[in-house]
Amino acid sequence: YVDGRGNLTPSEGTFKFLEDIFNRTITVQPDDVLPLFGILERYNRITNNDFIVASSFTYIINSKSQFFERNFSQLRFKIEGAGSLLNALTATYKVVNTEGSTKNKLFGVEYAQYAKAEVDFIKHFPIGKQSSLAFRSFLGVAIPYGNSDNIPFSQSYFAGGTTDNRGWKAYRLGPGASGSILDYNEANMKITLNLEYRFPILGALKGALFTDVGNIWNVADDTR
């Protein structure tokens, strides 16, 4: 898998290698086929072109009156819609897809169409003079419809990481309702609960005990 000069071509060479495996030009062990297929599936998902025209509305209720206030709560609502305007324009002006696809395209790219809603609640309250308890809950769901069968990768949810389910690296947890073999797990619904007890140790050194509960799921979405 080298070019005319004998140099390795990582990108093209990878695809030629996978193509030879799937065409059975190269023989591999059956247990190795699934991970190799996962590489190709992951690449196609992450690099897929998406044309997104969206509008959103966010409403936040925050009881915090001072920057260093320890007892406060915040409730955030967000709704977002994408693709409805483009769908109306293509229907009004009778834009014809000449490529034989069942999906409408603009500039040669299928436009995304989905509805998304999120609610996020945070509560901090003091326990004693320097200790505090922090709670956070999050629910988000994005449903594709019309011109889309799945949510664009950039608009999907993932679990894990330093501010999420901290027992897993980012994108390594879930989906809860899928047999995904991908390293970058993502889905269109997420539920998370976090509870953290923060306390002083010595001077400016602080400590925390926490528990994280949550996962991601594929709901009305054909992503695997």
Indicate where each model-derived feature is located.
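Surface-exposed, low-complexity/disordered segments
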Residues: Y1-A54, S63-K64, F68
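C-terminal transmembrane beta-barrel domains of outer membrane proteins
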Residues: Y1-V2, T9-P10, E41, A54, ...
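Phosphate/ATP-binding catalytic cores across multiple sugar-kinase/actin-like superfamilies
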Residues: T58, N62, E196-Y197
